[in-house]
Structures are given as structure tokens and as C-alpha cells.
């Protein structure tokens, strides 16, 4: 199976997601896609060049890094499913609003034109505040599927939501059948 895997800039989640990504890459052909932020920013969680190198090495191919590279993915039918993980509040807003201004949102737009599933693994500090309407909008749209999610450290960050990244593969399997993995809320 050919799986698109798009990383956005929730940098603290990259190490955990790389483990899931590695599992997927061992069993499937992966099309790596990086948001511009994920590809270029060095943070306290790691250097961008090391992250990009690891993503590309595991997939044995260059990552899609801009709109021009992402645009042909849809018309070519390049993927059976697209996973966006971590899907940030910013990306949720763009998807909900139909804004296509980067490689991840362009890949999603092109993929959806083929009526194929997009799996979102959210990681956002404002999931129960500013991002809540965007989550609701996408839950109500065809071909979007969510990795089950819940509050992330409810005492310290009461509006923060995070997907259970270990559920990405089961979510993908059901999304390919047109079904949402349940329970959705953890």
C-alpha cells in the first residue's frame, strides 16, 4: 500500500511519531510530506536537518517540501491514504477553511479530489478552545478520519488535545474501508 505521511510542526511529538512512521515505512511504500515549518526550524526538540534526513532515510525517498512538489500527488493518485501527524491547530484551521498554502494542505486537497481518506492525528494546545470549531467541521466532512484523541495533561493544559499515535495504523485500516475507528474520544 502507498501511504502519504505528512508531518506538521508540533515538534515535541516528532520523536514518538518517527517510531510509528518507521513501522509504516517497513511494511508499506511511504510518500513523506513535510510542512515548511517541520522542514526548516531547529527547535529544542531537535535540528531540522537531522529530522528531514531521518524522514527521508526511512522512506528511501526525498520528502515533498513545497506546494509545487505536492500538487501532482492528487492528479497522479499517488497515495491510497494520507496521514497528517501531528496535525496542528493551524493545519486544522486551514483544512477546515479550504486554505491551500503549503505542501501538507496541498497534498490533502489533491488527495481529497480523488475521494480518498485523510487521517488526522491531532496535537494542539487549543483543541477545546479556538480549534474546536475546526475539529467539529472536519468531523462532519466526508473522507476525513481522526485518530482517537483526548485531553493532554488536563490539569496543566485544560484545552490541549492529543491523538493516541499508537492508533494511527488501526485508524488507517478502517479509513480505507470508509469507517471511523471507535471510540473516537479517549
Which residues make up each language-model segment?
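A cross-family phosphate/adenosyl-ligand binding-site feature
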Residues: 1-118, 125-186
